[in-house]
From Swiss-Prot:
Residues 39-98 are annotated as: Disordered. This is Cell division protein ZipA. PANTHER family: CELL DIVISION PROTEIN ZIPA. GO terms for cellular component: cell division site; plasma membrane. It holds the Pfam family ZipA_C. InterPro entries: Cell_div_ZipA, ZipA_FtsZ-bd_C, ZipA_FtsZ-bd_C_sf. The chain crosses the membrane at residues 5-25. The lineage of its organism: Bacteria, Pseudomonadati, Pseudomonadota, Gammaproteobacteria, Pasteurellales. Residues 43-62, 72-95 have a biased composition (Polar residues). The gene is zipA. It comes from Actinobacillus succinogenes (strain ATCC 55618 / DSM 22257 / CCUG 43843 / 130Z). Keywords: Cell cycle, Cell division, Cell inner membrane, Cell membrane, Membrane, Transmembrane, Transmembrane helix.
């Protein structure tokens, strides 16, 4: 025989053995389960009789004389008092003894009927017949008293509930009288405090703050006599010095060389109307430009003024012109010192 055939036969035999072993073990477990269930059902039947006998309530004979009736009433009252005065551990002990079904083995001799919990609802509905205390004619029927524990318990509650009702009725007229009385005048309601006290400070805040005096510092850069600055040369020189064409159609020198930063000084055309046309600089010409700075200015005024003086000198050098003061005089060292002294 081939080796593969032998291995296949051995595998089939092993599978058959495993299936047979599984079926056999399953049947054995089922048989053990049914045996345990039958034993479990037999135990409650054997233990049910003592509990049934213990749960039978006592039926007193109501036709007994007065002494026997008094003894019966004491027998029902003493277990109740004993159970109320006992500790919580003693109260839970009969409950644990009254459930024998949870134990594997149960001895019927250990059942104590006197420790079973009493049915208090049945005791409350018991009618007790007492003998007549007064001497009456023979043949008079005894008076029957019905004991209702619920009425005795609810009576104090009704009294305590009705007491606040009368007190509330008495308090209502007092409250109405107090409301009708006029409220005493307090110094808070005086008309003097209703006057607008804060009108003067509000008026002071509404007044605009006095504007700071404005001043202009100006320099001229002019071409030589009988000559002019041409547009392309002027635009190139202004771009090299960091000027940007902007508001008012003139060039501005900003604090941070960006349009977002404030302008510190500007350049305007001397000729009217004093503006520039960046798209027509090829045909543009002028005799000079004016550099001016308005005070107060952003940043350090003295540093900004020095920067404007240096820009005027550089612009005159690139265009071949010269710098003049506001009085159209030559801008020399003395004039520069006088300009710096103004800030």
């Amino acid at each position: 025989m081939d080796l593969n055939t032998i291995l296949i036969i051995l595998g089939i035999l092993a599978l058959i053995g495993l299936v047979a072993h599984g079926i056999w073990s399953n049947r054995r477990e089922k048989s053990q389960y049914f045996d345990n269930e039958n034993a479990f059902h037999r135990n409650p039947q054997s233990t049910g009789r003592p509990s049934a006998q213990a749960s039978q309530p006592m039926t007193p004979n109501f036709a007994q004389p007065a002494k026997e009736t008094e003894q019966i009433r004491q027998t029902y009252q003493e277990p109740q008092v004993r159970q109320m005065s006992s500790s919580p551990e003693q109260q839970t002990r009969p409950t644990a003894q009254a459930m024998p079904e949870n134990r594997a083995e149960f001895n019927p001799n250990t059942v104590q009927p006197e420790q079973q919990p009493l049915d208090f609802n049945a005791a409350e509905n018991i009618k007790i017949t007492l003998p007549n205390t007064e001497t009456r004619a023979g043949g008079a029927e005894p008076i029957r008293y019905e004991y209702h524990a619920e009425e005795e318990r609810s009576a104090p509650l009704e009294q305590t509930f009705n007491q606040p009702v009368y007190t509330e009725d008495r308090a209502v007229p007092d409250m109405q009288v107090s409301l009708r009385q006029p409220a005493p005048e307090s110094p808070i309601s005086q008309p003097t405090l209703q006057q607008p006290v804060n009108d003067a400070p509000a008026y002071q805040h509404s007044q605009p703050a006095p504007a700071e005096p404005t001043d202009f510092i100006m320099l001229y850069v002019v071409a030589p006599e009988n000559r002019q600055f041409h547009g392309p040369s002027l635009a190139q020189a202004l771009d090299n010095l960091g000027f940007i064409f902007g508001q008012g159609n003139i060039y501005h020198r900003h604090l941070d060389l960006t349009v977002a930063s404030p302008a510190i000084f500007s350049v305007a055309n001397i000729n009217q109307p004093g503006t520039f046309n960046p798209h027509g600089m090829q045909d543009f010409s002028t005799v000079g430009v004016a550099l001016f700075m308005q005070l107060p200015v952003a940043g350090n005024p003295r540093a900004n003024l020095k920067m404007m003086i240096q820009a005027a000198k550089n612009l005159a050098s690139q265009l071949g012109g010269f710098v003049l003061t506001e009085q159209q005089e030559e801008f020399d060292v003395m004039a520069e010192a006088a300009y710096l002294a103004r800030v």
